[in-house]
Amino acid sequence: MREEKILCTKFKTRSRKYSSYKGQVGKVAPNVVDRDFTATKPNRIWLTDVTEFRIKGQEEKIYLSPILDAYNGEIISYTISRHPTLELTNTMLENALKKITEADKEELIIHSDQGFHYQHSSWSCKLEENKIIQSMSRKGNCLDNSPMENFFGILKQEMFYGVEFKDYEELIKEIDKYIEWYNNDRIKTKLNGMSPVLFLSLIHI
Protein backbone atom coordinates (compact mmCIF):
# COMPACT_ATOMS: atom_id res chain seq x y z
CA MET A 1 0.00 0.00 0.00
CA ARG A 2 2.82 2.40 0.72
CA GLU A 3 4.16 2.03 -2.81
CA GLU A 4 0.76 3.11 -4.16
CA LYS A 5 0.65 6.06 -1.77
CA ILE A 6 -2.50 4.60 -0.18
CA LEU A 7 -2.47 4.36 3.58
CA CYS A 8 -4.83 2.60 5.96
CA THR A 9 -4.84 4.58 9.20
CA LYS A 10 -4.91 2.47 12.34
CA PHE A 11 -6.61 3.81 15.42
CA LYS A 12 -5.83 2.88 19.00
CA THR A 13 -6.26 4.47 22.38
CA ARG A 14 -3.09 6.45 22.92
CA SER A 15 -0.97 5.91 25.98
CA ARG A 16 0.39 8.77 28.04
CA LYS A 17 3.00 10.77 26.14
CA TYR A 18 6.61 10.25 27.15
CA SER A 19 8.09 13.23 28.99
CA SER A 20 11.81 13.75 29.52
CA TYR A 21 11.20 16.84 31.66
CA LYS A 22 12.93 16.51 35.06
CA GLY A 23 12.65 20.11 36.21
CA GLN A 24 15.36 22.68 35.65
CA VAL A 25 18.53 20.60 35.70
CA GLY A 26 20.61 22.75 33.38
CA LYS A 27 20.32 25.53 30.84
CA VAL A 28 16.82 26.51 29.68
CA ALA A 29 17.11 28.32 26.36
CA PRO A 30 14.63 30.98 25.16
CA ASN A 31 11.88 30.08 22.69
CA VAL A 32 13.64 31.58 19.68
CA VAL A 33 11.47 29.76 17.13
CA ASP A 34 8.25 30.92 18.83
CA ARG A 35 6.05 28.67 16.64
CA ASP A 36 7.41 30.18 13.42
CA PHE A 37 8.56 27.03 11.65
CA THR A 38 9.07 28.76 8.30
CA ALA A 39 12.49 27.93 6.88
CA THR A 40 13.54 29.44 3.55
CA LYS A 41 16.45 27.01 3.15
CA PRO A 42 17.39 23.56 4.46
CA ASN A 43 19.41 23.42 7.68
CA ARG A 44 17.98 26.63 9.10
CA ILE A 45 15.53 25.18 11.67
CA TRP A 46 15.88 21.68 13.05
CA LEU A 47 13.31 20.25 15.46
CA THR A 48 13.88 17.35 17.82
CA ASP A 49 12.20 15.36 20.59
CA VAL A 50 12.06 11.85 22.04
CA THR A 51 9.13 9.45 21.85
CA GLU A 52 8.63 5.98 23.30
CA PHE A 53 7.17 2.72 22.00
CA ARG A 54 5.93 -0.19 24.09
CA ILE A 55 4.81 -3.52 22.67
CA LYS A 56 1.60 -4.79 24.23
CA GLY A 57 2.25 -7.16 27.10
CA GLN A 58 5.84 -6.07 27.64
CA GLU A 59 7.19 -3.75 30.31
CA GLU A 60 10.31 -2.78 28.39
CA LYS A 61 10.18 0.17 26.00
CA ILE A 62 12.27 1.62 23.20
CA TYR A 63 12.92 5.29 22.51
CA LEU A 64 13.22 7.14 19.20
CA SER A 65 15.11 10.42 18.92
CA PRO A 66 14.92 12.13 15.49
CA ILE A 67 15.87 15.50 14.04
CA LEU A 68 13.38 16.96 11.55
CA ASP A 69 14.31 19.74 9.12
CA ALA A 70 11.50 22.31 9.13
CA TYR A 71 12.27 23.21 5.51
CA ASN A 72 11.03 19.99 3.92
CA GLY A 73 10.08 17.76 6.85
CA GLU A 74 12.93 15.33 6.24
CA ILE A 75 14.29 13.27 9.12
CA ILE A 76 17.95 14.25 9.03
CA SER A 77 19.20 11.90 11.72
CA TYR A 78 17.74 9.56 14.32
CA THR A 79 18.73 7.08 16.98
CA ILE A 80 16.83 4.27 18.71
CA SER A 81 17.65 2.89 22.14
CA ARG A 82 16.16 0.78 24.90
CA HIS A 83 16.91 3.56 27.37
CA PRO A 84 16.32 7.36 27.12
CA THR A 85 19.93 8.24 27.87
CA LEU A 86 22.04 11.26 26.97
CA GLU A 87 23.84 9.04 24.46
CA LEU A 88 20.55 8.62 22.58
CA THR A 89 20.23 12.33 21.81
CA ASN A 90 23.91 13.23 21.67
CA THR A 91 24.73 10.54 19.12
CA MET A 92 21.81 11.68 16.97
CA LEU A 93 23.11 15.26 17.10
CA GLU A 94 26.68 14.27 16.27
CA ASN A 95 25.53 12.24 13.27
CA ALA A 96 23.40 15.12 12.00
CA LEU A 97 26.18 17.69 12.30
CA LYS A 98 28.46 15.54 10.13
CA LYS A 99 26.06 16.10 7.23
CA ILE A 100 26.21 19.90 7.06
CA THR A 101 28.83 22.57 6.42
CA GLU A 102 30.36 24.97 8.92
CA ALA A 103 28.47 27.79 7.20
CA ASP A 104 25.18 25.94 7.71
CA LYS A 105 25.90 25.48 11.40
CA GLU A 106 26.28 29.23 11.91
CA GLU A 107 22.76 29.84 10.53
CA LEU A 108 21.10 26.89 12.25
CA ILE A 109 18.56 26.90 15.09
CA ILE A 110 17.86 23.63 16.92
CA HIS A 111 14.54 23.61 18.75
CA SER A 112 13.41 21.13 21.41
CA ASP A 113 11.31 20.90 24.54
CA GLN A 114 12.83 21.41 28.00
CA GLY A 115 13.70 17.75 28.49
CA PHE A 116 16.78 16.93 30.53
CA HIS A 117 18.65 15.80 27.41
CA TYR A 118 18.54 19.31 25.99
CA GLN A 119 19.24 21.15 29.24
CA HIS A 120 22.35 19.05 29.85
CA SER A 121 25.74 20.64 29.26
CA SER A 122 26.73 17.89 26.81
CA TRP A 123 23.97 19.14 24.48
CA SER A 124 24.19 22.89 25.02
CA CYS A 125 28.00 22.93 24.85
CA LYS A 126 27.97 20.99 21.58
CA LEU A 127 25.65 23.62 20.12
CA GLU A 128 27.80 26.46 21.40
CA GLU A 129 30.96 24.85 20.00
CA ASN A 130 29.33 24.75 16.58
CA LYS A 131 27.83 28.27 16.81
CA ILE A 132 24.30 26.85 16.67
CA ILE A 133 21.40 28.72 18.27
CA GLN A 134 19.49 26.72 20.88
CA SER A 135 15.73 27.19 21.20
CA MET A 136 13.28 25.55 23.61
CA SER A 137 9.51 25.30 23.87
CA ARG A 138 7.76 26.70 26.88
CA LYS A 139 7.28 24.10 29.61
CA GLY A 140 4.48 21.67 28.87
CA ASN A 141 3.48 23.31 25.58
CA CYS A 142 3.51 20.74 22.77
CA LEU A 143 2.27 23.28 20.20
CA ASP A 144 5.63 25.02 20.45
CA ASN A 145 7.11 21.99 18.67
CA SER A 146 4.07 20.95 16.65
CA PRO A 147 5.77 19.68 13.44
CA MET A 148 7.80 17.23 15.50
CA GLU A 149 4.72 16.12 17.44
CA ASN A 150 2.84 15.73 14.14
CA PHE A 151 5.57 13.47 12.79
CA PHE A 152 5.35 11.23 15.84
CA GLY A 153 1.58 11.05 15.44
CA ILE A 154 1.78 10.15 11.75
CA LEU A 155 4.49 7.55 12.31
CA LYS A 156 2.56 5.77 15.06
CA GLN A 157 -0.76 5.85 13.19
CA GLU A 158 0.77 4.48 10.01
CA MET A 159 3.13 1.79 11.29
CA PHE A 160 2.62 1.13 15.01
CA TYR A 161 -0.92 1.43 16.35
CA GLY A 162 -2.92 -1.74 15.80
CA VAL A 163 0.10 -3.77 14.67
CA GLU A 164 1.39 -6.73 16.66
CA PHE A 165 5.17 -7.02 16.81
CA LYS A 166 6.77 -10.24 18.02
CA ASP A 167 9.71 -8.42 19.63
CA TYR A 168 11.56 -5.12 19.73
CA GLU A 169 14.05 -6.19 17.07
CA GLU A 170 11.15 -6.44 14.61
CA LEU A 171 9.75 -3.09 15.72
CA ILE A 172 13.12 -1.35 15.31
CA LYS A 173 13.45 -2.74 11.78
CA GLU A 174 9.99 -1.43 10.93
CA ILE A 175 10.81 2.02 12.30
CA ASP A 176 13.97 2.05 10.16
CA LYS A 177 11.97 1.05 7.08
CA TYR A 178 9.27 3.60 7.80
CA ILE A 179 11.65 6.55 8.15
CA GLU A 180 13.40 5.55 4.90
CA TRP A 181 10.01 5.45 3.18
CA TYR A 182 8.82 8.66 4.85
CA ASN A 183 11.84 10.61 3.60
CA ASN A 184 11.95 9.20 0.08
CA ASP A 185 8.42 8.18 -0.88
CA ARG A 186 5.71 9.63 1.36
CA ILE A 187 4.22 12.60 -0.47
CA LYS A 188 3.32 15.88 1.22
CA THR A 189 0.71 18.33 -0.03
CA LYS A 190 2.75 21.33 1.09
CA LEU A 191 5.69 20.01 -0.97
CA ASN A 192 3.56 20.01 -4.14
CA GLY A 193 2.88 16.30 -3.89
CA MET A 194 6.53 15.33 -3.50
CA SER A 195 8.46 13.50 -0.83
CA PRO A 196 10.94 15.46 1.32
CA VAL A 197 14.00 14.08 -0.49
CA LEU A 198 12.54 14.56 -3.98
CA PHE A 199 11.44 18.11 -3.17
CA LEU A 200 14.90 19.02 -1.93
CA SER A 201 16.63 17.47 -4.94
CA LEU A 202 14.44 19.34 -7.45
CA ILE A 203 14.62 22.67 -5.66
CA HIS A 204 18.41 22.54 -5.59
CA ILE A 205 19.10 21.35 -9.15
Language model feature labels by segment:
Residues 203-205:
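Conserved small/polar residues in nucleotide/adenosyl-binding loops
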Residues 173-193:
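K/E-rich alpha-helical interaction surfaces of small helical-bundle regulatory domains
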Residues 20, 112-114, 120-121, 136-156, ...:
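RNase H-like two-metal-ion nuclease catalytic core shared by retroviral integrases
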Residues 1-41, 141, 196-200:
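Basic, flexible linker segments flanking DNA-binding modules
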Residues 35-76, 83:
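An active-site-proximal beta-strand-loop segment
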Residues 60, 79-103:
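Active-site beta-loop-alpha junctions of metal-dependent nucleic acid enzymes
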Residues 1, 33, 49, 67, ...:
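Mobile genetic element proteins and their domesticated derivatives, centered on retroelements
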